Each structure stands twice: as structure tokens, then as C-alpha cells.
């Protein structure tokens, strides 16, 4: 159990180190603390905090820095989110106030904005797609035997894939397949659409056309692409500014992390909390032992919940970053609801 003074000392060490990146000694603390106390008393309190594993000494300095356990204690017991300044609030309002044609554009822009505001790496995920239904497939001829297949879902998402018309088929045949798909699948959830494409639809298409060579696979691919989680990442290279690993394999591993959905699912997929902070070893990835991850959900009503996240150093400014995420997700929720209302009214 920490005394009030020890709590003040720990809080000040975290604040000073996360803002300035320098170890803190007893003299600095004596000048910064809101209570009057001698340097000797502060050293005794620091010794206790060090013994408890909440702060540690750096080899190059007589000052102390927070340990991973110290950051965890600070986040759990002492942290209060810092309110955004006027300039930051205006940046968010301006960025989210732009005209967006698709949901993906909003979520992609959000990742870029969060990265610019924090100088860390930002990740965003649009609301869960499991309840989205098929509004319809569209086909756009591109010339020659090239065609663009477009899937439009009920939540306003548009997914497209270019393909070559399979041998033995022509554009009229492909149009007939498209009509069969729309007649039978519009209004079904994307999971149900995928299931039908795997089971009864091939037989139906074959009954009408006496062949379904390759065409069903194309529809399956675009449905699978639409259904999967799609992460947007801002400031990928920012992560290298805070990595203590300088070998090529570690750097390659960090950058590869952002290109593999399975790894991102492992990093972000289990964060069901409204607001969550994972520090160092809690991320269960050896490459991220020097990093912290803050995640926050944003609510879009009946459209589901999305996710925003900040990946930065364990010495990140937690108070400022949490305050930013808390405000940003409220603004993002409002912007998404506004987008969907416009979509429903159109």
C-alpha cells in the first residue's frame, strides 16, 4: 500500500519521464511536488518504490524511471485523461467534417489523423460486418474480356475485384449469372451469401448455363474480401522511432506485423473492453516488449462497433493519448452515424 506522498512521487516520475524522456532525481521531485518535503525523505520514498518494482535506475544516470510495473500501476490507479487543446479539437472536427464517399474513407482518414496527432502508429477498424446484408452485385465492363465485379452491402461498403471472363463464357453469360445471384441472394447476410455460393448456387448456375467454370470462385472471392476485417494503419514507420531493436530481422518483423491480418487479429482481436491499455509483455509478442497498446471501441448504434488503437512506446504520454482517443471516438461515432443516416435517406 502506497502513501499519498509515494503516489505523488510515482505519478510525477511517470509524468516527467513520459513528457521529457529523462530520468528523475530527488532534487527535481522536490521542486515539482505540490507538497513541501526534503530531498532525503524523497530518496527514502523512491527507495521503497524501487524495492516494490515500480521504478528502476538507469545505468547512465542517478535518476529513476518508471518500470513496466510502475506504468501498469499508474494506468490502473493514478491516470486521468488529459483534455485536448483547442487546436487538436479543431483538427479532429475539420478532418472528420470532410465529405466521404465510403465508410472505408472515414476509417482510413481516422488512422492518418490519429497518427499525425500522436506521432505514434494508429490502427483503425470499421464496425463489425457480420450483420451486413447484400444490397447487390454490379458488373462493369472494362474492355476486352476484363470485367469489374462490385459488391454493395447494406452498410454502404463497396468491394470490387477485376477479373477475366472465363473461357467458354461471354459478357452476356456473365450478366445472366449476375442476375441469378441478385435474384437469390439480395437481402442475405454476407455469411449466408458465402454459404450459398459454396452449396446450392453452383448447381443452380449449372442448371441454367450447363457450366459454372470459374465464375462462382470470383463471386466467392469478392464476398470473402468484403466480409473480412480490414485494418487501416497510419504512421507505420513511426514504430521504428521507438524500437530498441536495431537488427534487421526485428525491424522487418515489426513492419511485417502490419501486413498480416492474422497478426493484427491476434494483437487487437481480443480487446473487447470499451477502453483498454496493454503494456510491454502483456502484448504477448516479443517484438512489442518495448511498446504499449491503447484500444478504444466506438459505437455506431445498430451498425455495430468499430475499433481505434494507438501503438507507441511504453513511455508514451498515457494521459494525453487516452484523452485524445476518448474524444476522437465520440467524434468518429457521430460522423459515422451521420454518414449512415445520409445513406439511409438517399
UniProtKB/Swiss-Prot annotation:
Keywords: Repressor, Stress response, Transcription, Transcription regulation. Gene3D superfamilies: 3.30.450.40, Heat-inducible transcription repressor hrca homolog, domain 3, Winged helix-like DNA-binding domain superfamily/Winged helix DNA-binding domain. One of its GO terms (molecular function) is DNA-binding transcription factor activity. SUPFAM superfamilies: GAF domain-like (SSF55781), Winged helix' DNA-binding domain (SSF46785). GO terms for biological process: negative regulation of DNA-templated transcription. The keyword Repressor applies. Pfam families: HrcA, HTH_DeoR. The keyword RNA-binding does not apply. Negative regulator of class I heat shock genes (grpE-dnaK-dnaJ and groELS operons). Prevents heat-shock induction of these operons. Belongs to the HrcA family. NCBIfam families: hrcA. This is Heat-inducible transcription repressor HrcA. It comes from Pediococcus pentosaceus (strain ATCC 25745 / CCUG 21536 / LMG 10740 / 183-1w).
Amino acid at each position: 500500500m502506497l502513501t499519498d506522498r509515494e503516489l505523488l512521487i510515482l505519478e510525477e516520475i511517470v509524468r516527467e519521464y513520459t513528457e521529457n524522456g529523462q530520468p528523475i532525481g530527488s532534487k527535481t521531485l522536490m521542486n515539482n511536488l505540490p507538497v513541501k518535503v526534503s530531498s532525503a525523505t524523497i530518496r527514502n520514498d523512491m527507495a521503497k518504490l524501487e524495492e516494490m518494482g515500480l521504478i528502476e535506475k538507469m545505468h547512465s544516470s542517478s535518476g529513476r524511471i518508471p518500470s513496466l510495473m510502475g506504468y501498469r500501476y499508474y494506468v490502473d490507479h493514478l491516470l486521468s485523461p488529459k483534455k485536448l487543446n483547442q487546436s487538436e479539437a479543431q483538427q479532429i472536427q475539420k478532418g472528420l467534417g470532410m465529405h466521404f464517399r465510403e465508410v472505408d474513407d472515414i476509417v482510413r482518414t481516422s488512422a492518418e489523423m490519429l497518427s499525425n496527432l500522436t506521432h505514434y502508429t494508429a490502427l483503425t477498424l470499421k464496425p463489425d460486418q457480420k450483420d451486413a446484408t447484400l444490397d447487390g452485385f454490379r458488373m462493369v465492363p472494362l474492355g476486352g474480356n476484363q470485367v469489374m465485379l462490385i459488391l454493395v452491402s447494406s452498410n454502404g461498403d463497396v468491394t470490387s475485384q477485376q477479373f477475366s471472363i472465363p473461357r467458354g463464357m461471354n459478357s452476356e453469360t456473365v450478366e445472366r449469372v449476375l442476375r441469378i445471384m441478385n435474384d437469390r441472394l439480395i437481402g442475405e447476410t454476407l455469411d449466408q451469401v458465402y454459404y450459398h455460393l459454396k452449396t446450392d448456387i453452383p448447381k443452380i448456375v449449372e442448371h441454367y448455363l450447363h457450366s459454372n467454370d470459374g465464375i462462382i470462385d470470383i463471386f466467392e472471392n469478392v464476398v470473402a474480401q468484403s466480409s473480412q476485417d480490414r485494418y487501416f494503419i497510419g504512421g507505420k514507420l513511426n514504430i521504428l522511432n521507438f524500437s530498441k531493436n536495431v537488427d534487421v530481422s526485428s525491424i522487418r518483423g515489426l513492419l511485417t506485423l502490419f501486413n498480416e491480418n492474422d497478426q493484427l487479429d491476434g494483437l487487437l482481436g481480443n480487446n473487447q473492453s470499451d477502453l483498454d491499455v496493454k503494456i510491454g509483455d502483456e502484448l504477448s509478442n516479443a517484438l512489442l516488449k518495448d511498446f504499449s497498446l491503447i484500444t478504444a471501441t466506438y459505437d455506431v448504434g445498430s451498425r455495430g462497433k468499430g475499433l481505434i488503437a494507438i501503438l507507441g512506446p511504453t513511455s508514451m504520454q498515457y494521459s494525453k493519448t487516452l484523452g485524445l482517443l476518448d474524444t476522437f471516438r465520440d467524434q468518429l461515432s457521430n460522423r459515422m452515424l451521420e454518414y449512415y443516416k445520409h445513406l439511409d435517406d438517399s
